[in-house]
Each structure stands twice: as C-alpha cells, then as structure tokens.
C-alpha cells in the first residue's frame, strides 16, 4: 500500500476530491455495514467521482485497500485494524481534521450499506450518535497541542473500537448448522 501522502496525491492527480482518510473511512463504512461483494465499487464511483470509474491503476490500489480493511476487521482477535490518517503526528490539527473527515465518510459508507441506521437503539445507537459528534470535532488553534494530541489519540482509539463493534454487529449471520444425525 502507498503511504498516506502518496495515495492522497494519486487521488488528487485523478481528479478525485477526497483525502486518503476520507476514502478509507468510506470503504470502512461500507465494509462494516456488511458489503463484501463487488457492489462497493459502484457506490464508490457514485459517491466519490460523480458516477465515473476510477483510472485502472488507482482502482487496483483502492481494491487492495478495501481488501486490507476487510482482512483487518475480520481478524477480531488480532484487533489490529487502524484508521488511515496522516502520519505527521507533529501537526495535531491536521490529524484532528482528518479524523473528522474519516468519521464523516465512515458514516456515509455505513449509512449506504445500512439504510435504517437511524433506527438503531442501545449500544449501537449510542455508537452512531458518538460518531456523529466526532464528525463535528472542534478545536481552537490556541489549544495546548500536547493536551489536544493526547485527547485526539484517545478519540482515534474510541473510533477504531466503534468501527470494530459495528463491523461485528452488521455482519450477515450465517444460519447455525445443526449436526447431522445418522
């Protein structure tokens, strides 16, 4: 997989007005919502590129990213799914903006995969509400960067946990196989 900045540049070069964080959030939302077949591609084109296909090389890269996300989310025991945010940890404001964008596009993807998302109750409903709040994350540039950085890392970890929770919740349930009696 490309680096965050290289991939963001690939998107920009292709005329796609998304950051790597936004695209990663969108794909993660679709996957967490239960879309595992190729139906993610038309949704990607429709909602990120005015219904136009991506250039072949870029689509191959996006497909690898989609497969990587699926693999990481499916490995619940490993719990090593990560949000794809800018690597530059010195610029906490850029990372905070990217988290907000990731979360916003995650909810878009999740909502497309689960159209009745607003009807969810209990823990899942609370998780959705929390994600909506995180989309509107605000800060003041005069805030203490160290405190903001620590808070941001906690929020990133919380969003990561919620993504895994939602992935588990919305996965199609396979019918329980009963043992065959002879």
UniProtKB/Swiss-Prot annotation:
Question: Record's Gene Ontology CC terms?
Answer: cytosol
Q: By its UniProt entry, which SUPFAM superfamilies does this protein fall under?
A: YgfB-like
Please identify the protein, giving its name as recorded: UPF0149 protein PM1723
* The species this protein was found in: Pasteurella multocida (strain Pm70)
Write out the similarity annotation: Belongs to the UPF0149 family.
The protein's matches in PANTHER family, at most eight in alphabetical order, are given as: UPF0149 PROTEIN YGFB (PTHR37528:SF1)
Source superkingdom: Bacteria
Report the leader peptide range: none
């Amino acid at each position: 997989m490309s680096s965050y900045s290289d991939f963001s540049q690939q998107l920009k070069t292709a005329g796609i007005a998304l950051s790597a964080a936004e695209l990663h959030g969108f794909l993660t939302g679709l996957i967490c919502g239960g879309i595992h077949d190729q139906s993610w591609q038309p949704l990607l084109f429709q909602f990120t590129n005015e219904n136009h296909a991506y250039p072949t090389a870029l689509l191959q890269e996006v497909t690898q990213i989609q497969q990587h996300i699926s693999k990481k989310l499916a490995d619940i025991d490993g719990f090593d799914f990560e949000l794809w945010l800018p690597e530059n940890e010195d610029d906490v404001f850029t990372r905070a903006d990217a988290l907000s964008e990731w979360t916003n596009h995650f909810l878009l993807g999740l909502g497309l995969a689960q159209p009745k998302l607003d009807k969810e109750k209990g823990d899942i409903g609370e998780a959705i509400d929390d994600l909506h709040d995180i989309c509107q994350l605000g800060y003041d540039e005069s805030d203490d960067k160290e405190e903001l950085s620590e808070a941001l890392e906690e929020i990133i970890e919380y969003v990561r946990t919620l993504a895994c929770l939602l992935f588990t919740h919305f996965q199609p349930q396979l019918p329980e196989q009963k043992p065959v009696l002879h």
